[in-house]
Amino acid sequence: MKEKRALFVAGPTCSGKSALALAVAERLGGTVINADSMQIYRELRILTARPDQEEEARVPHRLYGVLPASQPGSAAWWRDQAITAMEESWQQGRLPILCGGTGLYFHALMHGFADIPDPGEEARQEARSLLAELGPESLHARLAEADPATAARLKPQDSQRIARAWEVWRGTESGLSAWQNQPPRPLPGWDFAAIRIDPPREELRQAITARLHGMLDNGALAEVEALRVQALDPSLPAMRAHGVPEFLAFLRGDISLPEAMQRAAQATIRYTKRQATWFRNRPFVKPPFLYTIDARIASFQQLSERSMADMLNFIRAFH
């Protein structure tokens, strides 16, 4: 049986992945599937530069804005959802195009995770109750007695991961670290190719600053204010998205808007460095199934005719 095919469009934040994935999907008949850990959150369209409604209407888009900010996503959850979206896209005769900069997601999709049993609702409720009653640091201390290997890897303030580790220990009678040491479940039946955008660092820095200004003009502060009134746990993934902590500090009156902008830009730039390091050190697809573009893609038309032809031929040969 012929292997199914999927394409990654990968690169650091603000490199132009979404524009490129959309253009490829339009030209080759694809479905764009989100592989960004923050674009899954419903309330974060502006701050995560999610495709707008007009772009989403041009080709099928999946897994964008599907979780509320109050619900933590995970790589394991995303993997299950992405596999379903890929299968549906392939059955419809469309090329699955996974677009994002979260290297862990790409690695998880291809290589899988250990199969951790569901700890059950009773264990989840206990973890939530203890977290509310004791706070993360005290619950972390209890976890250190029950599952020291996992506790040693967690920060005492990381309430979501501490609660998850506690519920796994209580519900499965085995520590989370022990389950994670089990052999992973790789994804069979799929072949992957990748387009990786790798722009110069200074070009990326300028684009990040410009994007932040554009986000302010488009309502980023209102987006953060809508999160603030929900009084969510600050350790939730959505509350740690680039720009959210910084603009929250501004809205509280702790810092000025220029300082919030500077901090948000610096945090994003540091993140792009970590993304680049991940892609260099853990390549998820290697030549000849990897096509690299060494410039930021502001639009598909920015590519030269030769580059466009070469890239599309690369995809067609794989697909």
Curated annotation (Swiss-Prot):
UniProt binding sites for substrate: T13, C14, S15, G16, K17, S18
Reactions catalysed: adenosine(37) in tRNA + dimethylallyl diphosphate = N(6)-dimethylallyladenosine(37) in tRNA + diphosphate
EC number of this enzyme: 2.5.1.75
Organism: Granulibacter bethesdensis (strain ATCC BAA-1260 / CGDNIH1)
Annotated transmembrane regions: none
Function: Catalyzes the transfer of a dimethylallyl group onto the adenine at position 37 in tRNAs that read codons beginning with uridine, leading to the formation of N6-(dimethylallyl)adenosine (i(6)A).
Obligatory cofactor(s): Mg(2+)
Name of the encoding gene: miaA
Record family assignment: Belongs to the IPP transferase family.
Name of the molecule in the record: tRNA dimethylallyltransferase
Subunit structure: Monomer.
Coiled-coil regions listed in the entry: none
GO molecular function: ATP binding; tRNA dimethylallyltransferase activity
InterPro entries assigned to the protein according to its UniProt record, in alphabetical order: Dimethylallyltransferase (IPR039657), IPT (IPR018022), P-loop_NTPase (IPR027417)
Top-level enzyme category: transferase
Annotated positions binding ATP: G11, P12, T13, C14, S15, G16, K17, S18
Top-rank taxon, per record: Bacteria
Keywords, in A-Z order: ATP-binding, Magnesium, Nucleotide-binding, Transferase, tRNA processing
Region described as Interaction with substrate tRNA: spans on this chain: 36-39, 160-164
GO terms of biological process kind: tRNA modification
Annotated site residue numbers, Interaction with substrate tRNA: T102, R124
